[in-house]
């Protein structure tokens, strides 16, 4: 018996290019694993704590794992409790970029849940992630933050677990294929394409198709996508052109310092900050009248991370790479790094870039509270602000704000908003969808109102695309019924099958690819091990060889007789081989040794042989044995009518029983043709008997005993027993009698060589499929 451990998996809808496809017809109804389920547990109709779980064919993938910038502690996390039962089975966590709203919950998820899967990021993302979150842990320790989500050991554990990938690199894990593409947005940002059972899902993360000062725009994956999970931060808004945006930004800053004010630019330490530093440094170089105005950048973290920017200059655009050949564009001439507010001379005009970007806490909040009541000062908000944050609140220009110490103070400084957030706008999003043409689009990472407007616009523009906007912890289910395709390999395709042929082989499934192989090819095409179980059984048998062979030939068709030497004395024992698979060695008057290689079919045949031999041994008189004396007939001759007549006469003369001399058992080697003739006569007798039982009495032809006449209510038919054919003018009667004869033949004839009667029952070893000639 061939044992193989089948790899678990399912068929994909993709087509392989090979000579032969074998397709199993789909059953009616939808199976559970045909449903692809997408559940945002963060970023569903909101911006912040991006985290999306995808489930399909038993595989589970999580995209991003961030915190919400408007909250702190456990309430800032994605809704992990809503997927608690799924967490131990999540295969992959794919993190798109280093921003906290996409990555800051990773240490918590890896260290404090039952997650056991693999984590992937690009090289720059991992480098900056480590620095950003080390800083987060230090700040939490200094402020003795009770809401601290994780500590240094959790972060270290996550860094050990994170694996790095490059753009366009293909990774495969547990039947899931992963490829990442450049997403623009920030250094190292990636879109992730995953493929499960031929269904392709693209998660964009935050992306921008517009090239800026240092980054290339997002690329369009060159493959057909089935589901697109895409950000919708800016909804239907359209960004102003880059040069206009830069001009408005530098003008806003210039106006503040020109009136001797202090200009605060709240930014996140990394990402857009580097873009803004490039713009300001270039503007200051071009405007000597501003050289006396210092630009401060208060971030030791950013200074540390600039090393990463220099390392991965090759992942930036041509402009930066060309400039890098001359000098490092990230070594600024007019920008001073300072550690904090203590070493800062707060006199005269200045430009101050400080984090965080939404003024929730930290240095940017301290400076804002210090400067907000002086009308000479100004703030330029350069990125997207989330609902519930101070940055979002002051954009509506309230008369006063509440400081962190709960004191209300007037808001007199000027508030400007210039978007540098490097998110996709409506034009970029719709162009991207137009190029990819996905049947399904799932919107995430957007304010509920913006997302709703974007959905309406996309539905109007792309009438055939299904656009979905799930809320947090709510799932969308999409049905994919992939074509079930198996590829034939090895010796099984030596003779290519025709339509409706039966293919016998072993179906080996691994990671949604399927192959049908001959058992003998298993070790050539897989790493599976096969074993053959050899069976040997001894049965007591005191009857004659003639009884044995005659009985077997009535049941089994392909029989070869030979002799086999056993022991050292040169004794030769009669041997019978059935279907080239099963060997019977006859020990005269003592026993039969049965040998075979175990498999489903051979075991079944051997069961029947054992039953047959046991019956002969218990009651030899119950076995109808044919006359053995036909050695005078030439083996090559056809069986004639005269042969049949002679056989019938000899049967009448034949006396029951064996030779009188019981002391000496004679082995009679009986001619193959004579036994064949005897079996044919038996078949004719059975056919005649059973036809008479079914249709009543037949009249035997006067001149030929092998012709029967049937006559009932003027319905006439002639049956030729020798050829088992029927003549009749009544086609219905003719067909009816022919069908009866076929059924009788099937029941009384030996089992055929091809064993179809048995094999068709053997569903595990047979795969009946239609042949696909695509």
Curated annotation (Swiss-Prot):
Residues involved in Zn(2+) 1 binding: 97, 99, 185, 206
Keyword annotations: Endonuclease, Hydrolase, Metal-binding, mRNA processing, Nuclease, Nucleus, RNA-binding, Zinc
Basic and acidic residues: bias regions: 638-655
Gene3D superfamilies to which the protein is assigned, alphabetical: 3.40.50.10890, Ribonuclease Z/Hydroxyacylglutathione hydrolase-like (3.60.15.10)
Domain of life of the organism encoding this protein: Eukaryota
Principal location listed in the UniProt entry: nucleus
Biased composition (Basic residues): 1-26
GO molecular function, one term: RNA endonuclease activity
Record's function text: Component of the cleavage and polyadenylation specificity factor (CPSF) complex that play a key role in pre-mRNA 3'-end formation, recognizing the AAUAAA signal sequence and interacting with poly(A) polymerase and other factors to bring about cleavage and poly(A) addition. Has endonuclease activity, and functions as an mRNA 3'-end-processing endonuclease.
Protein name: Cleavage and polyadenylation specificity factor subunit 3
Organism for this UniProt entry: Dictyostelium discoideum (Social amoeba)
Gene name of the encoded protein: cpsf3
């Amino acid at each position: 018996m061939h044992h193989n451990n089948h790899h678990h998996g399912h068929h994909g809808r993709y087509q392989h290019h090979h000579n032969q496809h074998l397709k199993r017809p789909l059953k009616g109804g939808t199976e559970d694993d045909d449903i692809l389920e997408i559940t945002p547990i963060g970023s569903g109709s909101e911006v912040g704590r991006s985290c999306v779980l995808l489930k399909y064919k038993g595989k589970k993938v999580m995209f991003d794992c961030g915190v919400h910038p408007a909250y702190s502690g456990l309430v800032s996390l994605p809704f992990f409790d809503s997927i608690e039962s799924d967490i131990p089975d999540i295969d992959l966590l794919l993190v798109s970029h280093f921003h906290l709203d996409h990555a800051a919950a990773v240490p918590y998820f890896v260290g404090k849940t039952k997650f056991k899967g693999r984590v992937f990021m690009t090289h720059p993302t991992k480098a900056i992630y480590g620095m950003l979150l080390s800083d987060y842990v230090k700040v939490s320790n200094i402020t003795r933050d009770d809401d601290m989500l994780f500590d240094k050991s959790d972060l270290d554990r996550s860094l050990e677990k994170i694996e790095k990938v490059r753009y366009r690199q293909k990774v495969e894990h547990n039947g899931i294929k992963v490829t990442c593409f450049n997403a623009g947005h920030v250094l190292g940002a990636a879109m992730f394409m995953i493929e499960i059972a031929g269904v392709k899902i693209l998660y964009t993360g935050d992306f921008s198709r517009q090239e800026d000062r240092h980054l290339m725009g997002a690329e369009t994956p060159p493959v057909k996508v089935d589901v697109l999970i895409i950000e919708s931060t800016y909804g239907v808004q359209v960004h102003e052109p880059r040069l206009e945006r830069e001009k408005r930004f530098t003008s806003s800053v210039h106006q503040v310092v020109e009136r001797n004010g202090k200009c605060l630019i709240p930014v996140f330490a990394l990402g857009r900050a580097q873009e803004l530093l490039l713009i300001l440094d270039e503007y200051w170089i071009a405007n000597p009248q501003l050289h006396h105005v210092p630009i401060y950048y208060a971030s030791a973290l950013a200074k540390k991370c600039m090393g990463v920017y220099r390392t991965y200059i090759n992942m930036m655009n041509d402009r930066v790479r060309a400039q890098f050949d001359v000098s490092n564009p990230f070594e600024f001439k007019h920008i001073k790094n300072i550690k904090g507010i203590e070493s800062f001379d707060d006199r005269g005009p200045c430009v101050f870039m400080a984090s965080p970007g939404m003024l929730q806490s930290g240095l940017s909040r301290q400076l804002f509270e210090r400067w907000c009541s002086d009308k000479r000062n100004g703030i330029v908000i350069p990125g997207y602000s989330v609902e519930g944050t101070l940055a979002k609140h002051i954009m509506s220009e309230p008369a006063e704000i509440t400081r962190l110490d709960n004191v209300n103070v007037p808001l007199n400084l000027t508030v400007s908003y210039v978007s540098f957030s490097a998110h996709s706008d409506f034009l970029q999003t719709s162009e991207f969808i137009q190029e990819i043409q996905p049947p399904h689009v799932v919107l995430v990472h957007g304010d509920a109102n913006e997302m709703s407007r974007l959905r309406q616009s996309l539905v109007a523009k792309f009438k055939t695309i299904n656009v979905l906007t799930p809320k947090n912890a709510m799932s969308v289910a999409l049905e994919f019924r992939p074509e079930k395709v198996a590829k034939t390999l090895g010796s099984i395709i030596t003779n290519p099958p025709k339509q409706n042929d039966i293919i016998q082989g072993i179906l080996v499934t691994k990671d949604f690819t399927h192959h049908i192989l001959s058992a003998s090819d298993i070790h050539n095409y897989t790493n599976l091990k096969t074993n053959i179980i050899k069976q040997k059984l001894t049965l007591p048998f005191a009857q004659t060889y003639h009884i044995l062979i005659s009985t077997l030939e009535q049941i089994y068709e392909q029989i070869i007789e030979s002799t086999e030497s056993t022991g050292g004395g040169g004794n030769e024992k009669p041997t019978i081989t059935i279907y080239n698979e099963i060997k019977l060695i006859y020990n005269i008057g003592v026993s039969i040794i049965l040998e075979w290689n175990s498999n489903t079919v051979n075991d079944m045949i051997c069961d029947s042989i054992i039953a047959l031999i046991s019956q002969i041994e218990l009651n030899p008189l119950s076995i109808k044995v044919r006359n053995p004396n036909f050695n005078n007939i030439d083996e090559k001759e056809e069986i004639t009518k005269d042969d049949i007549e002679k056989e019938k006469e000899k049967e009448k003369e034949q006396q029951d029983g064996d030779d009188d001399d019981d002391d000496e058992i004679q082995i009679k080697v009986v001619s193959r043709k004579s036994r064949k003739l005897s079996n044919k006569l038996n078949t004719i007798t059975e056919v005649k008997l059973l036809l008479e039982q079914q249709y009543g009495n037949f009249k035997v032809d006067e001149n030929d005993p092998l012709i029967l006449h049937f006559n009932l209510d003027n319905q006439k038919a002639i049956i030729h027993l020798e050829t088992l054919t029927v003549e009749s003018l009544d086609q219905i009667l003719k067909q009816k009698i022919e069908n009866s004869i076929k059924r009788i033949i099937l029941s009384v004839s030996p089992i055929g060589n091809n064993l179809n009667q048995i094999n068709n029952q053997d569903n595990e070893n047979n795969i009946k499929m239609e042949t696909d000639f695509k």
